[in-house]
A protein has these predicted regions:
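Eukaryotic scaffold repeat domains enriched in small/polar residues
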Residues: 1-177
């Protein structure tokens, strides 16, 4: 009937009582609500990875053909957690056109900026090495599918990879533990 339902997936609350929410089919970022329950703003929006081939086709396609192309939407957030200092930690899927992990874990400050330290040998995005194709049956391919995150009191954080059933724990500098 054309009705769009608000479908919240995860929430976190800071020390002042502000509520942060991620919802299905919300691409503008994490929603922040005042203590009164009124909407305040979006923060921490994921970026769209540019697809050069798609840009090329849009220059030569007709308007009808362009309309049939998939929209370039940023990846949705999959989970959020709040640490004791009021920073939001968030996980997201990789962009559909991404060929590498692209900051699928973020530490978001009150300005909405990602301030995650990524000083480790690999970025804190789950599996650093993975197969993209395989002819063998039963081989899992693709980047980690991050669906969960939690933060400890000392700043370590653990992410959950649903694809391979793994947990990855990192320190506050982004080093895998």
């Amino acid at each position: 009937t054309g009705v769009t339902l608000f479908n919240p997936q995860k929430v976190a609350v800071d020390q002042t009582g502000r509520l942060y929410c991620i919802a299905q089919n919300v691409y503008e970022g994490i929603m922040e609500f005042h203590t009164s329950g009124s909407f305040n703003r979006f923060l921490g929006k994921n970026e769209v990875v540019a697809n050069p081939l798609k840009k090329f086709w849009t220059k030569i396609f007709s308007e009808t053909q362009i309309a049939s192309l998939n929209l370039d939407l940023p990846p949705e957030f999959t989970n959020i957690a709040m640490d004791e200092n009021g920073f939001l930690y968030a996980t997201s899927h990789p962009d559909a056109d991404a060929t590498t992990n692209a900051n699928m874990v973020k530490m978001i400050n009150t300005s909405g900026k990602d301030i995650m330290k990524r000083n480790g040998y690999v970025t804190p995005d789950g599996d650093a090495v993975y197969l993209t194709t395989s002819t063998e049956e039963g081989v899992i391919i693709g980047m980690s599918n991050l669906v969960g995150i939690t933060v400890s009191k000392n700043g370590n954080f653990t992410i959950v990879d649903e694809l391979r059933g793994r947990l990855f724990t990192y320190d506050n500098e982004g080093n895998i533990i």
